[in-house]
Swiss-Prot record:
Organism lineage string: Eukaryota, Fungi, Dikarya, Ascomycota, Saccharomycotina
Gene assigned in the entry: PHO85
GO cellular component: cellular bud neck; cytoplasm; nucleus; Pho85-Pho80 CDK-cyclin complex
Sites where the protein binds ATP: 13-21, 36
Native organism: Eremothecium gossypii (strain ATCC 10895 / CBS 109.51 / FGSC 9923 / NRRL Y-1056)
Protein name as catalogued: Negative regulator of the PHO system
Family that this chain belongs to: Belongs to the protein kinase superfamily. CMGC Ser/Thr protein kinase family. CDC2/CDKX subfamily.
Length: 301
């Protein structure tokens, strides 16, 4: 039975939704770990979010998913022992911004990170798990350049029916239009939309759709991707928060948009993948497995 005395607590790394994260040292092995401490309310017991994260994470063993080694349950706190990662994608991108203009990562690195992101997502989806909160802050990177999915605080194994999910998922900028319009029957496609937003952000060095509220978020999406109609997305007008007053924006040239933010040449193959991930109609979005088979990743096949 592991106890917290096996670990030496080092500096605090951050505060999550319901936990504080510390860097720790395993005194037995000499390896660094991340210690996620969840304070327990004596009345309430263990938060259900933490229980959900634990049961999911212990099953998920994949090189692109942060490994949960152990769970230590004491009277007033729960300590989750994760593998230690040096950085996250958000901090990594921020540290490399060209001060002249917002510029993203080199395209070879973008491709390598996106491949790893999709590998992790595909593994989740094969195991009937939605991540539901993919964003650069939740993609952890070590000094070997490995990228891994972390923070499954909102993840939930999905089954049938799937129309009971709460709409409180995914940070606004990475939130799919179907979720923003109140769809309650979403599935793996919500993670795919987030993957598309992250891919664009790695190239551009800034968020593709940086909205401040649901309405503005949808407006930004439609201004770029075009306003959906019943012709392009059957059932869109039946969604609870569909607004028939929204202007009919034409779709913009994504290639031009991306090219304006980088000195490297944006290929049609890359644009094609982004368009496949950022389909407004969730049923038209690529699956993670289809995205991994995309010609952009030919060298990895």
């Amino acid at each position: 039975m592991t106890s917290t005395s096996q670990f030496k607590q080092l500096e605090r790394l951050g505060n999550g939704t319901y936990a504080t994260v510390y860097k720790g040292l395993n005194k037995t092995t000499g390896l660094y770990v991340a210690l996620k401490e969840v304070k327990l309310d004596s009345e309430e017991g263990t938060p259900s979010t933490a229980i959900r994260e634990i049961s999911l994470m212990k099953e998920l063993k994949h090189e692109n998913i942060v490994r949960l080694y152990d769970v230590i349950h004491t009277e007033n706190k729960l300590t989750l022992v994760f593998e230690f990662m040096d950085n996250d994608l958000k901090k990594f991108m921020d540290s490399r911004l060209d001060r002249e203009m917002p510029r993203g990562l080199e395209l070879s690195l973008v491709k390598y990170f996106q491949w790893q992101l999709l590998q992790g997502v595909a593994f989740c989806h094969e195991n009937r798990i939605l991540h539901r909160d993919l964003k650069p802050q939740n993609l952890l990177i070590n000094n070997k350049g490995q990228l891994k999915l972390g923070d499954f605080g909102l993840a939930r194994a999905f089954g049938i029916p799937v129309n009971t999910f709460s709409s409180e998922v995914v940070t606004l900028w990475y939130r799919a239009p179907d979720v923003l319009m109140g769809s309650r029957t979403y599935c793996t496609s919500i993670d795919i939309w987030s993957c598309g937003c992250i891919l664009a952000e790695m190239i551009m060095g800034k968020a593709l759709f940086p909205g401040t509220n649901d309405d503005e978020q949808l407006k930004l999406i439609f201004e770029t991707m075009g306003t959906p109609t019943e012709q392009t997305w059957v059932g869109v007008s039946q969604l609870p928060k569909y607004n028939p007053q929204i202007p009919l924006y034409p779709n913009k040239d994504i290639k031009q948009l991306l090219q304006a933010t980088t000195k490297e040449q944006i290929s049609d193959v890359l644009v094609n993948l982004i368009q496949g991930l950022l389909q407004l109609n969730p049923s038209m979005r690529l699956s993670a497995q289809q995205a991994l088979s995309h010609p952009l990743f030919e060298e990895y096949h």
